[in-house]
Amino acid sequence: MRGRPLLFPSYEADSAIFPSTTKKVAMAIFFLVALTLPLQLVPGLKWLGENVWLVILGQALIFAIGALGLNILTGMAGQVSLGHAFFMGVGAYTAVVLGGEASNSLVGLGLPMWIWLPAAGIVASLTGALVAPTAVRVRGLYLAFVTIGLVFVGDHVFRNVRNVSGGPGIGRKWPPIELKVWKEETSLLNLSADGSWFGVDVSRQAKQFVFLVVVSSLFALAHKNLARTRIGRAFAAIRDRDIAAEVMGVNEVRYKALAFALSSFFAGAAGALLAAFFGSRVPEAWDLLLSVQFIAIILIGGAGTTAGVLLGSFFVVMVPRLVETFTGWLADLTGETGPLSVVANFILATGPADFGLVGTTPVGPGLSVFQLNLVLYGALIVLFLIFEPLGLFGLWLRIRNYWKGWPFTY
């Protein structure tokens, strides 16, 4: 309404996905920047158009799809799950069985992506529906232990079904990201090789990044729309007060099972895309650490929110790269003189007799970059749970509300 932008005249206007012109313009700018990022046309962000960063951003988009699925179960329905990696593995191996190439020791049907990608989500969803009757009978800590058990069961199965997974430490090749009608040799759109679009030379990383922007946006839109439907309101009622929700007529068992199935669909699709994006994956990759990363994403980003999950995905995926870059910069400073060199020598342990937080040698003292990332994940989860339960999205709300209320503080 003109002059009253925050006044919604109807329920439909209040529950719209993009309720204001500002949000619509912001989303349009975001898509414009994202789709032109590989062309390195955006001032100040040209470095993100390099292939190494496009791979990192592509992984973040895939993680966002998986995290949106976990957010349905944990953020919307309030059910704690540490078994997300298991459902991602189910989706990944469904994809490789349907789309992978067969050999003397490996199973593969060679079907196109428009079959194996939806099938990965569907099979993972059916697996989640099979697990749900057992999982919905418990809650809280007991539910967490049940879902942890899925990860260890999956790890055992993935390692030993060698004609599907390729075996521990070996893995197998996943089907490429390309569009075909059926099993023909040439593809309609090959996203796994360098080429040209509209006369412009683009790398495979750029092609896959644009594809993942589109796919992840569709999943984010579905996630956002789910929150405002009858199913989403039932999830929120169960999360906030499950007994009261059941008294009011919400079928708790049915909606919890539905939350597991929907969450598993997102996880299966994300697992298939992740394995195809990197080309191969060993069975050990679908472990508990992967599940913890997704827990970190929704807690750091903001549980129950779409924007928070997207922020958390980019944050968690980019932290290891930023830590690696930061430690490399500190290592360059250790041989120089000055206050920065003193700080670098204090933080880094460059020799066996040094004392430092981060080690630069595989067998020396200090934490490795991988271990430091785990410490950062844990510390950030604790800090956000204590000081800002809504995560990065909560910080954004504080900044936005301060800006809207300035110069007043109330």
Task: Specify the residue positions occupied by each region the protein language model found.
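Transmembrane alpha-helices and adjacent helix-loop boundaries
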Residues: M1-Y410
